[in-house]
């Protein structure tokens, strides 16, 4: 075995080390052959056109003969003689083809003989899009360039890169020189011009501004740190943009091939393209953007059935927390970096590849090619930063070849026990000649394999993969050279985002108590793991040799089946009754718990009784045996409210005394003292002690509210909030009296200044109360009207700043919510418990939606208007797509940023114990379920709502949040 491996190594070296001249000759010969094939194809096409013309002429002659046959005999004889004399050259062809003309089909010429389908996979920013663009330029069927699109995109990349550097300098608490502050404002205003589809009016002046900002010592420090810190990294090739800024801003600028390849244009969908190499057609499908995660690879085989896989690995991203902390000399930057975890993209890519090797996509593919993307940055990094910081067992020092070999073995070790041909290639994807040299051999080998398997039909929507003309084909390629050693899996798999799990579990709760005030709210939860029922299976599906066993020593699990949510957040302006919407709207519930299953806990007492267990007809009667006779009489009456029964044992005792509310009152005085702190803090000074009471139909709620707010690591505090336990007592209301108590809570997270959020603090709820819809009792429409009116007021008074917002209106037992941007609200709902004596657990119910520019639905809305999402931001600048203010994005007919809110309406029950409103400074670091559990624990410890809010904000700060943090907690005490 060792001899064979040694021979394979030797043969591989001999194959991979030809002289440069011989390579050039081979390439020249290949080009000549390709040109000859193109000439032959053109000649065949011309012959085909001549055949078509001849067939048309023959058909015309037949029609003429038919017309002549109906004329007089004398005239027909003359005409037939004339026709015979004038068409002697075509008479033979007409007579010979007359009988078979209708049965003979004209041959269709193809530009290819064989074909294949390739899926390009890899981790984030590994070079997948770069590879696909390079292959399109080298072998593409059509010209991939769109000059106007890429000119605008590259212009946006250049501006977005500088804006990102400026924002990161603020995050790191380092200030640019005073001379550049005015230039910063001019640069930050340019995305607005881009939104209006205009290039800069004074391009040379803008280029000079960009040059001065780029050469600032602070920006250079941020750029150098971004190369090793994933938290402040700028996607794409920032240095390339900066070096070419004067060319980009030239009015006569036309993008080059390298400009197009270097342009960063994140797509969250599968990117498809077709190439042809020596009459071998390849359909490429690249998974970029959000599709880079392994959880999104589950349905790829069912939908595309790729024959081969290209897995791209970026070698330059191997930095760890310790390396970042020790390599930077700026104490301010080091302090900031200690507050967040640095992603090691190389290890993440290794984990993703291990997950891939245990998936159906890998098992059904014919071969896999590992593409190690070096680029110039890797060779620069390996000289400065030892790979040992990432892999403790590495002993190769700063030698690039040893480092590449070591990393390659880390990946190929997962393939050693797999019955799968594979091969690794080291390529600089930015070097067109290097890409051509490597992929000439790759496509030559793939063409041979496709020819053996008989893949002649290209990919289309009906067959989903090239179809073999041979049928069942059991031939397999031999294993490619493999020198890797099996090592047990040492790296933990990527944990699924808890936030995504929370949203995906909304279908698990069938007892919907939340309704929505608009028929176009985000409600669809669409699975991406569906199969194509009409797809035609390729020959590889019938190959029994594809079954592979997972390595028993691996620590990774199989690729999980997940679902992704695609939602719509547009709202309608028409008024709808909540009673009509109750049947059409769904509740966004996070967690599993189904209230209708609560009576099932009665079954445990049956188990110790063996004679009664095998009797199925007696199952509905057991409730009468373990409980007194009075309880079965109460159950038929209270079947509509099962949530109230699983409460602690004290509740049935209290149910016998419904007319005695004096027992819970001793616990209320301390709660009133806690809320008094809040009433004196934010616009609730008018609220008295009785304002905490909130009555409902058949029940009463005692409210306890509080807030916690931190400036955090930002230079300014741009958050504001409102707590009004008694809304009607705090505002001037001229409408009909409201007999039911109403409370209002809100958080406004400003950006670009404090003007907008400060103005929203007294404005939104006043607009809400003074609207006609509020007087009529249509609170859903009142929220829409209030948000629109408040936005108009803000736009008139605030030029540059903006703000997100989340609001909650509690009317009796109904909770109305609205939000724009990434400020959110979560309701804590008690889960049904089979054991009444057991602890109460809560599930988070998400009552808001994140309107980010990176969201699929929001991105579609913006791009349909002609907008651009660069670096997951609106024109590279604004992170949210819905907000108050942000005047520059709302001017003109095309409003790229809007203030239409996402709304929910919830009928609260005794199972709902508290809700949390907060800005993204909390939710970016704390998951929904974590926040609910945190509040639950502190309530048990007897802490007030204010204390809990402050502790929760501090917890987010300790986790490394660099934003302002504002948290509101409202506790619902039911009587």
Swiss-Prot record:
<feature type="binding site">
    <location>
        <position position="750"/>
    </location>
    <ligand>
        <name>Mn(2+) 1</name>
    </ligand>
</feature>
<keyword id="KW-0472">Membrane</keyword>
<comment type="similarity">
    <text>In the N-terminal section; belongs to the G-alpha family.</text>
</comment>
<dbReference type="GO" id="GO:0005525">
    <property type="term" value="F:GTP binding"/>
</dbReference>
<feature type="compositionally biased region" description="Low complexity">
    <location>
        <begin position="460"/>
        <end position="478"/>
    </location>
</feature>
<keyword id="KW-0378">Hydrolase</keyword>
<dbReference type="GO" id="GO:0001726">
    <property type="term" value="C:ruffle"/>
</dbReference>
<feature type="binding site">
    <location>
        <position position="963"/>
    </location>
    <ligand>
        <name>Mn(2+) 2</name>
    </ligand>
</feature>
<feature type="region of interest" description="G5 motif">
    <location>
        <begin position="427"/>
        <end position="432"/>
    </location>
</feature>
<dbReference type="GO" id="GO:0007165">
    <property type="term" value="P:signal transduction"/>
</dbReference>
<dbReference type="GO" id="GO:0016020">
    <property type="term" value="C:membrane"/>
</dbReference>
<feature type="compositionally biased region" description="Low complexity">
    <location>
        <begin position="500"/>
        <end position="515"/>
    </location>
</feature>
<dbReference type="Pfam" id="PF00503">
    <property type="entry name" value="G-alpha"/>
</dbReference>
<protein>
    <recommendedName>
        <fullName>Protein spalten</fullName>
        <ecNumber>3.1.3.16</ecNumber>
    </recommendedName>
</protein>
<feature type="domain" description="PPM-type phosphatase">
    <location>
        <begin position="704"/>
        <end position="972"/>
    </location>
</feature>
<feature type="region of interest" description="G2 motif">
    <location>
        <begin position="259"/>
        <end position="267"/>
    </location>
</feature>
<dbReference type="GO" id="GO:0030154">
    <property type="term" value="P:cell differentiation"/>
</dbReference>
<feature type="compositionally biased region" description="Basic and acidic residues">
    <location>
        <begin position="595"/>
        <end position="688"/>
    </location>
</feature>
<keyword id="KW-0807">Transducer</keyword>
<feature type="coiled-coil region">
    <location>
        <begin position="21"/>
        <end position="70"/>
    </location>
</feature>
<feature type="domain" description="G-alpha">
    <location>
        <begin position="114"/>
        <end position="458"/>
    </location>
</feature>
<dbReference type="InterPro" id="IPR001932">
    <property type="entry name" value="PPM-type_phosphatase-like_dom"/>
</dbReference>
<feature type="region of interest" description="Disordered">
    <location>
        <begin position="1"/>
        <end position="31"/>
    </location>
</feature>
<dbReference type="InterPro" id="IPR011025">
    <property type="entry name" value="GproteinA_insert"/>
</dbReference>
<dbReference type="GO" id="GO:0004722">
    <property type="term" value="F:protein serine/threonine phosphatase activity"/>
</dbReference>
<dbReference type="InterPro" id="IPR036457">
    <property type="entry name" value="PPM-type-like_dom_sf"/>
</dbReference>
<comment type="similarity">
    <text>In the C-terminal section; belongs to the PP2C family.</text>
</comment>
<dbReference type="InterPro" id="IPR001019">
    <property type="entry name" value="Gprotein_alpha_su"/>
</dbReference>
<keyword id="KW-0963">Cytoplasm</keyword>
<feature type="binding site">
    <location>
        <position position="920"/>
    </location>
    <ligand>
        <name>Mn(2+) 2</name>
    </ligand>
</feature>
<dbReference type="GO" id="GO:0003924">
    <property type="term" value="F:GTPase activity"/>
</dbReference>
<keyword id="KW-0547">Nucleotide-binding</keyword>
<keyword id="KW-0479">Metal-binding</keyword>
<feature type="region of interest" description="G3 motif">
    <location>
        <begin position="282"/>
        <end position="291"/>
    </location>
</feature>
<dbReference type="InterPro" id="IPR027417">
    <property type="entry name" value="P-loop_NTPase"/>
</dbReference>
<feature type="region of interest" description="G4 motif">
    <location>
        <begin position="369"/>
        <end position="376"/>
    </location>
</feature>
<feature type="compositionally biased region" description="Basic and acidic residues">
    <location>
        <begin position="8"/>
        <end position="17"/>
    </location>
</feature>
<feature type="region of interest" description="Disordered">
    <location>
        <begin position="541"/>
        <end position="700"/>
    </location>
</feature>
<comment type="subunit">
    <text>G proteins are composed of 3 units; alpha, beta and gamma. The alpha chain contains the guanine nucleotide binding site.</text>
</comment>
<keyword id="KW-0464">Manganese</keyword>
<dbReference type="GO" id="GO:0005829">
    <property type="term" value="C:cytosol"/>
</dbReference>
<feature type="region of interest" description="Disordered">
    <location>
        <begin position="455"/>
        <end position="520"/>
    </location>
</feature>
């Amino acid at each position: 075995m060792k001899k064979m491996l040694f021979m394979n190594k030797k043969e591989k070296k001999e194959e991979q080390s030809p002289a440069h001249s011989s390579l050039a000759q081979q390439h020249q010969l290949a080009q000549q052959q390709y040109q000859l094939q193109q000439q032959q194809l053109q000649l065949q096409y011309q012959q085909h056109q001549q055949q078509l013309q001849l067939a048309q002429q023959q058909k015309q002659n037949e029609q003429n003969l038919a017309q002549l046959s109906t004329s007089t005999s004398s005239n027909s004889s003359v005409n037939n003689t004339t026709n015979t004399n004038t068409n002697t050259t075509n008479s033979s062809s007409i007579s010979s083809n007359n009988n078979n003309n209708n049965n003979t089909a004209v041959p269709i010429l193809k530009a290819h003989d064989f074909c294949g389908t390739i899926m390009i996979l890899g981790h984030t920013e590994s070079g997948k899009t770069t590879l696909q663009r390079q292959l399109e330029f080298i072998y593409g069927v059509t010209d991939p360039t769109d000059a106007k699109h890429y000119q605008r995109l590259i212009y946006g990349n250049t501006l977005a890169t500088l804006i990102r550097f400026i924002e990161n300098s603020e995050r790191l608490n380092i200030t640019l020189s005073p001379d550049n502050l005015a230039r910063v404002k001019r640069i930050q205003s340019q995305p607005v011009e881009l939104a209006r589809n205009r290039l800069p009016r004074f391009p040379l002046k803008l280029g000079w501004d960009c040059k001065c900002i780029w050469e600032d010592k602070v920006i250079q420090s941020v750029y150098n740190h971004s190369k090793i810190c994933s938290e402040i990294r700028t996607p794409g090739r920032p240095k390339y943009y900066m070096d070419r800024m004067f060319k980009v801003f030239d009015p006569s600028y036309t993008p080059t091939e390298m400009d197009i390849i270097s342009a960063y244009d994140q797509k969250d969908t599968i990117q498809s393209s077709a190439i042809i190499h020596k009459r071998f057609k390849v359909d490429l499908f690249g998974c970029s953007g959000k599709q880079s995660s392994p959880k999104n690879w589950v349905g790829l085989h069912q939908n595309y059935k790729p024959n081969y896989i290209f897995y791209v690995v970026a070698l330059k991203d191997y930095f760890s927390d310790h390396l970042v902390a020790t390599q930077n000399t700026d104490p301010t930057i080091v302090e900031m970096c200690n507050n967040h975890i640095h992603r090691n993209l190389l290890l993440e890519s290794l984990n993703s590849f291990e997950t891939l090797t245990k998936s159906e996509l890998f098992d059904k593919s014919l071969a896999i090619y590992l593409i190690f993307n070096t680029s110039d940055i890797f060779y620069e990094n390996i000289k400065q930063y030892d790979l040992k910081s990432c892999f403790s067992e590495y002993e190769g020092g700063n030698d690039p070849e040893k480092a590449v070999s070591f990393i390659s073995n880390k990946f190929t070790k997962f393939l050693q026990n797999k019955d799968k041909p594979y091969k690794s290639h080291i390529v600089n994807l930015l070097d067109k000649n290097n890409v051509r040299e490597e992929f000439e051999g790759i496509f030559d080998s793939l063409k041979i394999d496709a020819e053996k398997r008989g893949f002649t039909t290209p990919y289309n929507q009906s067959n989903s993969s090239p179809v073999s003309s041979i049928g069942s084909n059991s031939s397999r390629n031999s294993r490619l050279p493999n020198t890797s050693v099996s090592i047990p899996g040492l790296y933990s798999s990527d944990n699924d985002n808890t936030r995504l799990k929370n949203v995906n579990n909304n279908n698990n709760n069938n007892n919907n108590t939340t309704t929505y005030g608009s028929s176009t709210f985000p409600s669809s939860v669409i699975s991406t793991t569906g199969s194509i029922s009409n797809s035609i299976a390729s020959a590889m599906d019938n190959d029994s040799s594809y079954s592979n066993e997972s390595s028993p020593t691996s620590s990774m699990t199989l690729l999980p089946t997940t679902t992704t949510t695609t939602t719509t957040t547009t709202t309608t302006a028409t008024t709808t009754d909540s009673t009509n919407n109750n049947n059409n709207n769904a509740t966004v519930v996070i967690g599993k718990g189904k209230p209708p299953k609560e009576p099932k806990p009665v079954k445990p007492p049956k188990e110790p009784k063996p004679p009664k267990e095998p009797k199925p007809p007696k199952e509905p009667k057991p409730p009468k045996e373990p409980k007194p006779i009075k309880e079965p009489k109460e159950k038929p009456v209270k079947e509509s409210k099962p949530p109230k029964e699983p409460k602690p044992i004290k509740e049935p005792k209290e149910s016998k005394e419904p007319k005695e509310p004096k027992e819970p009152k001793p616990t209320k005085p301390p709660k009133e003292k806690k809320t008094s702190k809040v009433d004196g803090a934010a616009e609730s000074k008018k609220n008295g002690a009785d304002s905490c009471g909130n009555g409902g139909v058949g029940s009463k709620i005692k409210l306890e509210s509080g807030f916690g707010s931190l400036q955090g690591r930002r230079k300014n505090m741009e958050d504001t909030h409102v707590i009004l336990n008694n809304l009607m007592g705090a505002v001037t209301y001229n409408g009909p009296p409201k007999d039911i108590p109403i409370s209002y809570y809100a958080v406004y997270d400003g950006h670009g200044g404090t003007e907008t959020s400060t103005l929203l603090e007294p404005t939104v709820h006043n607009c809400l109360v003074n609207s006609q819809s509020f007087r009529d009792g249509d609170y859903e429409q009142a929220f829409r009207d209030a948000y629109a009116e408040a936005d108009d007021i803000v736009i008139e008074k605030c030029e540059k700043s903006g703000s997100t917002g989340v609001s909650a209106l509690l009317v009796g037992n109904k909770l109305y919510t609205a939000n724009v941007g990434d400020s959110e609200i979560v309701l804590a709902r008690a889960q049904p418990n089979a054991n009444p004596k057991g602890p109460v657990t809560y599930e988070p119910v998400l009552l808001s939606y994140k309107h980010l520019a990176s969201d699929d639905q929001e991105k579609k809305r913006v791009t349909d208007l002609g907008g651009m999402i660069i670096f997951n931001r609106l024109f590279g600048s604004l992170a949210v797509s819905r907000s108050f203010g942000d005047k520059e994005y709302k001017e003109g007919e095309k409003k790229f940023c809007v203030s239409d809110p996402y709304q929910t309406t919830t009928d609260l029950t005794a199972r709902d114990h508290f809700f949390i409103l907060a800005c993204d400074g909390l939710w970016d670091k704390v998951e929904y379920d974590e926040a609910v559990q945190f509040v639950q624990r502190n309530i048990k410890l007897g802490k007030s709502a204010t204390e809990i809010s402050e502790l929760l904000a501090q917890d987010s700060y300790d986790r490394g949040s660099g934003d302002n943090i504002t948290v509101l907690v409202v506790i619902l005490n039911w009587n």
